[in-house]
Amino acid sequence: MLKLIRQSLPKPLKKVLSNIKKRTYDNWKKKLFFKRMQLKHIALLKKLKDKDKIKVVFLVLHKSVWKVDPLFKKMLEDPQFEPLILVCPYTSISLEGTRQDMMDVYKYFNEKGYPVISAYTAKGRRWRELSELGTDIVFFTNPYKLTKSLYYEEAYKNYLCCYVPYYFMATTHTGELSSQLNTLMLNSMWRIYWPHQYVFEQFSRHSVANGKNSKLTGYPATEVFLQSGHLKEQTKKAWKTQKSKKRKIIYAPHHTIENNDSSLSTFLQYGNFIRQLSNEYQDRVQWSFKPHPILKEKLCAHPDWGDKRTNEYYQYWRENPNTQLDLGGYDDLFNESDALIHDCSSFIVEYSFTKKPALYLLNPKNRSESFLNEFGKKIFENYKKAECKKDIVSFVDDIFNEKESQLSNKNSFFESYLDELYIKSTPSQKIIDDIKSEITH
């Protein structure tokens, strides 16, 4: 009967009732859940007081959104921690795609020499339980339900869980903050480490946790771009060897190819054009195609693209002498590059750390810059933007002619942001210090 009544209600009334439910009943449930989790966390912390080593399990679905590398390295060097990467299934794709993804992610971390295991044990033909790993603390690298419940709800309901955002949170494309920042998952976290003041304050405002479970630390993923002396010794060659010296440009398209107001991607407008440019400038410029990890599956499902056309496009970048396909980490790729052309969210801020020129491809629906939040707008003030193909060609020509000084994205707000959160202490060190202070308190 209730189902029939709901179906017969007018859409405007349904929306009003849904909003009332969110503000009352749903919020009441979240508050109760948050209080229960606080008590759970207190009990779990007590169990850690006398432990010599803390087992920290990092749940990873995609290698390209691994934004805690400096933190993981610090834990490896610290005798108080035993960090481990657990490769979890990305369940939004086919079984074969999931299997291949997990193999790729495992290989990526194994080649880095990191302790890593697969969530699936072939010998036992089952999915591993977190309890059998001796887990004390869990780090989430993604806030969404994209994997099995074992590595999502069952994890955040039963362990001391931490979260570092998988992107810099400078845009609004993922939805209203009132709903994005008030999920059960975020409210259940023992600790959330936010990259900047704006989102830290917004979480305090919108979540039933009122920000009590969060800290402002800065973004661990970008520490590497501020350690230039160290990088000169450590950096491996991320780019293909060329017969002659060429400028290095990254093309990084976002996955939101849907034709709606929240879309950032301009791939359908410029993807083929930039491929043509890579061919026209082959004697002068080498290119990296650095797509969002979800772009390929969306292109395969697109009526104008499909599997064959998508695979051919990716193959072009992988196989040509002056082009390459990069699907994993990008620290070295960024550091060795000369410029970035993109329409991504997080890269707006992340690439700013390199102090190199970047061109943002504006989606026709977002030319008012309404896709940026207050933090993003301040970072974006001096950004170079492209509204047409001519703007892209002009930027590439300037990079080839080494006119970087004319393309500077220098920003006083960004410099102040660096001074506040990165100079005295790094984000990863703040996170380590915070965890230690809590487990020894």
Please place each PLM-identified region on the residue numbering.
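Donor nucleotide-activated moiety binding/catalytic core segment of transferases
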Residues: 121, 302-349
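A short, charged/proline- and glycine-enriched loop
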Residues: 46-57, 80-81, 157-159, 243-247
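Catalytic binding pocket for nucleotide-activated donors in carbohydrate/polymer assembly enzymes
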Residues: 210, 305, 346-419
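Active-site and donor-binding regions of nucleotide-sugar-utilizing enzymes
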Residues: 57-226
